[in-house]
Amino acid sequence: MQPAGGTEIQLAYLKKYVNQGAIDAVQITTSVPEKIPLDPLKANILWEKNSWDQPNLYPWFKNKDNHSKYDWYVFNSHWNYHNFRKQFNVPEDRCTVIKNAIDYTELQLKTDFTPKDKIKMCYISTPWRGLEIALAAMEGIKDPNVTLDVYSSTEIYGKQFKDSNDSKYLPLYEKAKSLPNVNYMGYCDHTTLMSKLKDYDVNCFPSIWEETFCISAMESLAAGQILITTDLGALPETCCEFPVYIPYTNNKPKLAIQLAECILQVKNMFKHDLKDGLQFQQEYYKRFYDWKYIGQHWENFLRGVINVKRNQG
């Protein structure tokens, strides 16, 4: 199975859940403007998932003459859209927000919410998004009833990206392997990971990266995990009131200490019955973040885009 990041996975779901005729009638480019040449006959849509400050798109958006090149801009969160609006004054009448979503034929949900004394945690994001904080916290936790499995690698973006970038994170991988309460699992493909989330109680994700949405956080909450994370970027929008939030600070040692304290507090929470709250959390994401639901948003949107383009012609 080819490695794939969130953008590639969501594009595959779009093609799975949305009418192919509607997709073929437009041209959708993901994140990086003009990485696919503009189509002179179809409506051109930029599905923007990257942050406004990324070097592969900032100069393009900074030049306002470019803004008319796309018929529509689709953003993955309101947080992301409003950043582009404020930074670049993108045309508001040609922007919309359609969230990322979950393929529930792949995601397996937790069903066992029995109170427990031992908790299993996972870290399932790229190494630069907060792995160093998670490992520093685990280094300070001496409780044998708290363990962390680390699924993190640059391989998610393919062999070329890994060959160019993985070496800088080798010390983190080695540290994960050396800690007695941490298991370094390496790369795990998305489909397999969707079957594993149910086996963990907590997603330990002390994000130090401004997420424009955070698919892994959404999937963890939807599976029925408790999420420990920061309030950075679009995380509060994606995760609502469900996580245990740590106020973000760029003081990494302090953030690690706060995370360790939160982990021990969450461990105590599992001594009680959490079933009702976690099942409500599962129901919330099934209601609003199922690709069957989001796919209808896309179909309605594309139908309107196609009609406008046809009338213009």
Named regions from a protein language model:
Residues 162-191:
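Nucleotide-activated donor-binding/catalytic signature segment of Leloir-type glycosyltransferases, i.e.
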Residues 4-9, 250, 254, 271-306, ...:
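A charged, aromatic-enriched C-terminal amphipathic alpha-helix characteristic of glycosyltransferases
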